[in-house]
Swiss-Prot record:
Its EC number is 2.1.3.-. The keyword Disulfide bond does not apply. InterPro entries: CmoA, Methyltransf_25, SAM-dependent_MTases_sf. It catalyses: prephenate + S-adenosyl-L-methionine = carboxy-S-adenosyl-L-methionine + 3-phenylpyruvate + H2O. Catalyzes the conversion of S-adenosyl-L-methionine (SAM) to carboxy-S-adenosyl-L-methionine (Cx-SAM). This is Carboxy-S-adenosyl-L-methionine synthase. GO terms for biological process: tRNA wobble uridine modification. Gene3D superfamilies: Vaccinia Virus protein VP39. Belongs to the class I-like SAM-binding methyltransferase superfamily. Cx-SAM synthase family. Changing residue 89 to L: Lack of activity. GO terms for cellular component: cytosol. Mechanistic analyses show the involvement of a unique ylide intermediate as the carboxyl acceptor in the conversion of SAM to Cx-SAM.
Length: 247
């Protein structure tokens, strides 16, 4: 059962940096629905993309799986034999709950839920990889190497789904979408104090990129095609495709 997010409703003397700890994991479903515009649509559409791209006898990776929402969406839409989903997160609290969520929904496709660092996981025989609001928490200097590894581990014709919060090269547009996002959170019941305190904790650990920067990295990794398929305010998702005739 999900609890309502009230983590920042009272003043916190020393905020520190954001961590995905037990307190966050407990309220995460409510938090992300009220904080990330379009999140439910992205999760649903990841399942539709899985139906199109997952191939028999291959693996799907959910890198930074949190509580397993994307993993479950993928699994509901796999209709092939001998597939496996590998879900990884470095937060013990998230992984504990993820295992419970996965076990609560029975399906033929097995899921390996792993507590670990996505930078250390080998990507092999993959028809689809999901990075759902995960890359933004890596150091910018480490992002290209992860995308390179994903490209190498994808089979020809495979897909990467990359969802992120974006920054914008046009400052005026960035300001507008930033303010619209805050309006969204206010409309979902967050107070000015809650919005401010959460932003202060996130600003040193969640470093956003522009869509142009993401596309450049994907191109450098080897992806022949990439495009933004969903956006709501300053949140969105790209799909990157490995050519069917890639070596």
């Amino acid at each position: 059962m999900s609890h309502r997010d009230t983590l920042f409703s009272a003043p916190i003397a020393r905020l520190g940096d954001w961590t995905f700890d037990e307190r966050v994991a407990e309220v995460f479903p409510d938090m992300i629905q009220r904080s990330v515009p379009g999140y439910s649509n992205i999760i649903s559409m990841i399942g539709m993309l899985a139906e199109r791209f997952v191939q028999p006898g291959t693996q799907v990776y959910d890198l930074g799986c949190s509580l397993g929402a994307a993993t479950l969406s993928v699994r509901r839409n796999i209709h092939h034999d001998n597939c496996k989903i590998i879900a990884i997160d470095n937060s013990p609290a998230m992984i504990e709950r993820c295992r419970r969520h996965i076990d609560a929904y029975k399906a033929p496709t097995p899921v390996d839920v792993i507590e670990g660092d996505i930078r250390d996981i080998a990507i092999e025989n993959a028809s689809m990889v999901v990075l759902n609001f995960t890359l933004q928490f890596l150091e910018p200097s480490e992002r290209q190497a992860l995308l390179d590894k994903i490209y190498q581990g994808l089979n020809p014709g495979g897909a990467l789904v990359l969802s992120e919060k974006f920054s914008f090269e046009d400052a005026k547009v960035g300001e507008l979408l930033f303010n619209m996002h805050h309006d969204f959170k206010r409309a979902n019941g967050y107070s000015e104090l809650e919005i401010s305190q959460k932003r202060s904790m996130l600003e040193n650990v969640m470093l956003t990129d522009s869509v142009e920067t993401h596309k450049a990295r994907l191109h450098n990794a080897g992806f022949e095609h990439s495009e933004l398929w969903f956006q709501c305010f300053n949140f969105g998702s790209l799909v990157a495709l490995k050519a069917e005739d890639a070596a």
